[in-house]
Amino acid sequence: MHKLLKLAAMGTAACALLAGMAPVANAQEKQNVEVLHWWTSGGEASALEVLKKDLESKGISWTDMPVAGGGGTEAMTVLRARVTAGNAPTAVQMLGFDIRDWAKQGALGNLDTVASKEGWEKVIPAPLQEFAKYDGHWIAAPVNIHSTNWMWINKAALDKAGGKEPTNWDELIALLDNFKAQGITPIAHGGQPWQDATIFDAVVLSFGPDFYKKAFIDLDPEALGSDTMKQAFDRMSKLRTYVDDNFSGRDWNLASAMVIEGKAGVQFMGDWAKGEFLKAGKKPGEDFVCMRYPGTQGAVTFNSDMFAMFKVSEDKVPAQLEMASAIESPAFQSAFNVVKGSAPARTDVPDTAFDACGKKAIADVKEANSKGTLLGSMAHGYANPAAVKNAIYDVVTRQFNGQLSSEDAVKELVAAVEAAK
């Protein structure tokens, strides 16, 4: 059975981790994995297909549990309902502090055996290990490193604007003004709290990684209430003037489509957006440009899709470990992340198969990891527990929508974070 499980997992692991601990009651019986995830958009679904096909080729059937909603909030709601009902999925896509919450409850399994054997400690960046381990034990397998401080620009629109990529705030505003003059929507944006916060992440990071760390990771009241933070909110107000009237509630992938179709100039979004461009047959450097938000070069705010394994009966543990192993295999890390638009969760995966944006992502992550500027994203659950993140979301969204002045937003931010700690 061990051999069969090994085949089943090698390269499908992600699927499996995604899917989790496949129920393996009998080696003769077809194995099955049940996967709770929120990869439902075009590019994400393509990446998931890599996993499904790999699983199928190993004789493992797939029970899909997709939950729409890019931030994963809805998926967590479904998961809590399942666990409360005593029917947890075997593996679940999770982010940051959500993993810690389940680990604190003693609900997750232990992957130490495979992690130790394969030397995960040496190849998975320390900032990721802070979430993939709990009390010194591995409880999740990181699938990727998504970075959030990206801009995705329509190349034709950029060329019409002179072709210069903006490297600072003033150049960004000049570019957005040019897009407006071209008669297209300057910024493609979806008015959802997590999307507003994704822009705010990059804006705050543009004031320097030290400031970002003090404000969003250390939650330093002085940084949160500073004039620098007020400037960040002022910039959000300015950016708000470049979105279209119909932005409220728009899903992120529909905003990506606006840039892809030339209806908008730029989207501020994590590198999962690249999957949408690729799905539409677009090529980096020819049809679109990927670059870091101006002022954030040399730093990376990340989130990482991980698959947390729930505690399972003894007979299911071997499959669980085999699948975790498969997820971390360099071959799978490369194949999956090429399609997903992310960088591998390991620093030793060659960039050979990656396109220009992928190569840049891998290089940026390595640089940031070595400089100590690989920082957990506030907007995506890698800087703070959910209560704090949601408190920040609330202030950011109200300010972005004109319900708070920058001065009031700074005051509310300090109070909201303090109350949520």
From Swiss-Prot:
Chain segments annotated as transmembrane: none
GO cellular-component terms in the record?
periplasmic space
Q: Which UniProt keywords apply?
A: Periplasm, Signal, Sugar transport, Transport
Q: Which residues form the signal peptide?
A: 1-27
Q: Tell me the compartments it is located in.
A: Periplasm
Recorded hits in InterPro entries, A to Z, give: Bact_solute-bd_prot1, SBP
State the protein's purpose: Part of a binding-protein-dependent transport system for a sugar.
PANTHER family reported for this sequence: ARABINOSE-BINDING PROTEIN-RELATED (PTHR43649), BINDING PROTEIN COMPONENT OF ABC SUGAR TRANSPORTER-RELATED (PTHR43649:SF28)
| Family listed | Belongs to the bacterial solute-binding protein 1 family.
Name this polypeptide is given? Probable sugar-binding periplasmic protein
User: Which species expresses this protein natively?
Assistant: Brucella suis biovar 1 (strain 1330)
